[in-house]
UniProtKB/Swiss-Prot annotation:
One GO cellular component, as annotated: membrane
Pfam assignment, any one: Menorin
The organism's taxonomic lineage, starting at the top: Eukaryota, Metazoa, Chordata, Craniata, Vertebrata
Organism annotation: Danio rerio
Stated name of the protein: Protein FAM151A
Family: Belongs to the menorin family.
Gene: fam151a
Length: 599
């Protein structure tokens, strides 16, 4: 007992000594107080870390959190907007991405939480075409006429993000209340492009009686209620794999243009991706009507081919084509499009200035050479950097159904095969003498095009009889056009007059009917003129004021007069260097170049 008391006393004295020592920790706290302080600070730091992490994760996953947006007009360019928000690094429609049918709240949330840049959603009115129909815009694609998401709720959520907006209207009754909502939202700033889409015309594989959105009412409401948008007027389309060649026709495209040409807004035309290549002559014409126009390629269940997509890209301005295409095709397409020095998939009816890209865009800087036989062709393919190859075509003496190169026995097919196998930039100029050879030659071109080999500018020339020129033995202009359109229309038309008709030069009686005839064609047209006949007339000036028309001056090699037609030829150059071309010998070309430099 005593021992215990002594020990207890010793312990008590020790604790007292330690307590005195503890008071010296930082000169303020006891050990217990210091430990408690450290634990408390640690808990506070841990709580801050957890809180900040939670806020960051929620902000990232909850698309309803407001994003600060710089001011941007709702009718502004979509690519400019994506550049401004940092979504893309260059102004190229290839890099814009889309989310389809972001209609229900769950799909909308999924779209907002994704990395896509533009949300596309369908708008109708609640209970459309039923006794329960209201004027409340909802997000639903037919046959759905009810939704858990109204347009107002959709806009409230989407406008807190930095996504672009495309609204696809399924009925005219949804348009007015939707535009009222957009106008109201814009009071505080939509700050992103808004695209307004509706199918207003029947398109490929769709009968005329099929219901579409009334175009006149659609456009009138936009101008009245909320004109600050990009308009996306489309065709109602049905793609059928059993009819793969059905496409947008000339009449469909011209009808669309006549319907929208009065609109002041930016216009983007939605085009089915599987039908775009075959309809390209008409679609490219539509694009050429205004710099405000663009195309948006979209797809259904079937995937477009990479070759078809590359064809569209290689024949258009990258700022004017959008690709609403699904993965994995979109990524594959992007990779293929970025390959340097890949062969260009040029449209054979395209502009040779665009193909050859000569210095100063001057047609004189495009080289022309004539193919006389196999040896001359091989020499040109080996030694020349590229240019237009003039190929005179006639019938084989023993085989009238086999077109050959005039002056040799080389079949035209063999000639074309060698040209198409070359990696150099070549244009094809077929100089055809008879109607039979026209059909056979066009058939060879069609075959090459169908197997995806013909990616060269291709011109078809014939002396034709038309207007004041009625000379026995020559094909009529109307029959020439019909034959080309029937067999292979994807060419530049290069008609010329029989030499017997040029005694008085190119008179108005000759030229004006020819221009009128070919003005009806949808292809590019280059009228062929003989240099020695030019000085007898200046009627050629009529041609260069026509859209899609150009002039090609030919100088016969047997004519040694270097100054033949030179005055008119220089006048043609002065009028338009991009739309005047020169199928002339090297000596004559150098002479013109020298004269041009002096001037």
């Amino acid at each position: 007992m005593e021992v215990k008391e002594e020990k207890s006393c010793s312990i008590g004295e020790g604790e007292e000594a330690e307590g005195k020592e503890a008071k010296t920790v930082l000169g303020i706290f006891t050990r217990e107080q210091f430990i408690m302080l450290c634990v408390g600070l640690g808990l506070i730091a841990l709580l801050l870390i957890i809180t900040l992490t939670s806020v960051f994760v929620i902000a990232k996953s909850d698309a309803s959190v407001d994003v600060d947006m710089e001011p941007f007009p709702s009718d502004g360019d979509m690519l400019d907007f994506l550049l401004q928000t940092g979504e893309i690094e260059e102004k190229d429609g290839l890099y814009a991405t889309w989310y389809h049918a972001a209609n229900s709240k769950s799909e909308m949330s999924k779209a907002l939480n994704s990395d896509v840049m533009i949300l596309e959603a369908d708008v109708n009115v609640q209970g459309h075409n039923t006794v329960n129909e209201t004027n409340i815009p909802i997000m639903a694609h037919p046959p759905d006429i009810y939704s858990d998401n109204t347009l107002e709720e959709w806009l409230d959520a989407v406008l807190k993000s930095k996504k672009g907006v495309k609204l696809d209207f399924k009925s005219i009754s949804a348009v007015e209340p939707s535009l009222d909502l957009l106008r109201a939202k814009n009071q505080t700033g939509i700050n992103r492009p808004v695209w307004i889409n509706a199918d207003i015309l029947p398109g490929p594989n769709v009968p005329e009686f099929w219901p579409v959105v009334n175009a006149s009412e659609f456009f009138e409401l936009i101008q009245l209620k909320f004109p600050d948008v990009t308009i996306s007027p489309g065709w109602k389309v049905l793609y059928l794999s059993i009819f793969p060649n059905v496409t947008y026709t000339r009449s469909m495209v011209e009808q669309m243009y006549s319907t929208i040409r009065h609109l002041p807004q930016k216009i983007t035309f939605p085009v089915h991706a599987l039908m775009a290549k075959n309809g390209w002559p008409h679609l490219s014409w539509l694009l050429s009507q205004s710099s405000r126009y663009s195309l948006t390629l979209w797809q259904g269940k079937e995937n477009p081919t990479l070759n078809d997509l590359l064809f569209i890209r290689d024949n258009s301005n990258p700022q004017r084509i959008y690709y609403d295409i699904y993965e994995p095709v979109l990524s594959q397409f992007r990779e293929a499009a970025k390959i340097k020095d890949r062969p260009r998939r040029f449209y054979p009816g395209g502009d040779i200035v665009d193909y050859f890209r000569p210095a100063d865009s001057d047609g004189l800087n495009i080289q022309w050479d004539t193919v006389n036989d196999k040896d001359s062709l091989l020499s040109l393919l080996e030694d020349s950097p590229g240019g237009m190859l003039v190929i005179p075509v006639k019938s084989s003496d023993g085989h009238p159904n086999i077109p050959i190169i005039d002056g040799s026995e080389m079949p035209l097919k063999d000639c074309l095969d060698l040209i198409l196998a070359s990696t150099k930039p070549w244009g094809i100029y077929l100089q055809i003498k008879s109607q039979n050879q026209l059909s056979l030659s066009l058939e060879l071109l069609r075959q090459a095009y169908d197997i995806d080999l013909l990616h060269h500018p291709t011109w078809v020339n014939m002396d034709i009889s038309h207007g004041a020129v009625h000379i026995q033995g020559y094909m009529t202009g109307e029959e020439f056009l019909r034959t080309v359109d029937r067999i292979f229309p994807h060419v530049t038309l290069a008609p010329s007059w029989p030499k017997e008709a040029l005694v008085e030069g190119y008179t108005p009686e000759m030229l004006e009917p020819m221009v009128q005839l070919f003005h009806r064609a949808w292809q590019d047209v280059s009228l062929q003129l003989q240099a020695e006949a030019l000085d007898r007339s200046e009627t050629w000036r009529l041609v260069l004021v026509q859209p899609r028309f150009s002039l090609t001056v030919e100088h016969q090699t047997e004519n040694k007069d270097i100054n033949a037609g030179i005055e008119s030829l220089m006048a043609i150059r002065a009028a338009n260097r991009q739309r005047s071309f020169y199928n002339i010998p090297k000596m004559y070309r150098e002479h013109i170049t020298d004269l041009s430099v002096r001037k």
